[in-house]
């Protein structure tokens, strides 16, 4: 018989830098999960990602206090800010533009996010990322 699922926990943890401090420790501790075991497994799985990039993770906790987790790709907004060299998006994106991204940068981001996007093809994925860029107050060149 399959194990009974008791909780799903969604967090954003910096790649290869998980530690028991908040938000990881309290979120896992209240469900009785071994925090250090999660931190070691997460850090091992995210070794290939640039350290410090926020990585969404969905943790499934079972009734016997065991867990499994699935990592997602870094949010598009973080990748767009990195590509444009910004620390934050525009407070008024329709009127104040804070930076520019090129089609080549959008294609790179779309390739990195492809597994998590529901786009039918690469062109649709690029348009999706371009829409995110515009909503952050970035000018989009070539789309």
From Swiss-Prot:
Belongs to the universal ribosomal protein uL11 family. The lineage of its organism: Bacteria, Pseudomonadati, Pseudomonadota, Gammaproteobacteria, Pseudomonadales. It comes from Pseudomonas syringae pv. tomato (strain ATCC BAA-871 / DC3000). Keywords: Methylation, Ribonucleoprotein, Ribosomal protein, RNA-binding, rRNA-binding. Forms part of the ribosomal stalk which helps the ribosome interact with GTP-bound translation factors. This is Large ribosomal subunit protein uL11. The keyword Lyase does not apply. GO terms for molecular function: large ribosomal subunit rRNA binding; structural constituent of ribosome. One or more lysine residues are methylated. GO terms for biological process: translation. Part of the ribosomal stalk of the 50S ribosomal subunit. Interacts with L10 and the large rRNA to form the base of the stalk. L10 forms an elongated spine to which L12 dimers bind in a sequential fashion forming a multimeric L10(L12)X complex. GO terms for cellular component: cytosolic large ribosomal subunit. NCBIfam families: L11_bact (TIGR01632).
């Amino acid at each position: 018989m399959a194990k009974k699922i008791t909780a799903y926990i969604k967090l954003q943890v910096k790649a290869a830098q998980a530690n028991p401090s908040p938000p990881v420790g309290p979120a896992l501790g209240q469900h009785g999960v071994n925090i250090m075991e999660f931190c070691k497994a997460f850090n091992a799985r995210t070794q290939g990602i640039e350290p410090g990039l926020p990585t969404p993770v969905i943790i499934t906790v079972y009734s016997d206090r065991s867990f499994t987790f699935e990592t997602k790709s870094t949010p598009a907004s973080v990748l767009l800010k990195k590509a444009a060299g910004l620390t934050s998006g525009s407070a008024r994106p329709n009127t104040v533009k804070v930076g520019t991204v090129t089609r080549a940068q959008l294609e790179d981001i779309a390739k990195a996010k492809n597994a998590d996007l529901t786009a039918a093809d690469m062109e649709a994925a690029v348009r999706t990322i371009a829409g995110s860029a515009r909503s952050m107050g970035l000018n989009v060149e070539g789309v």
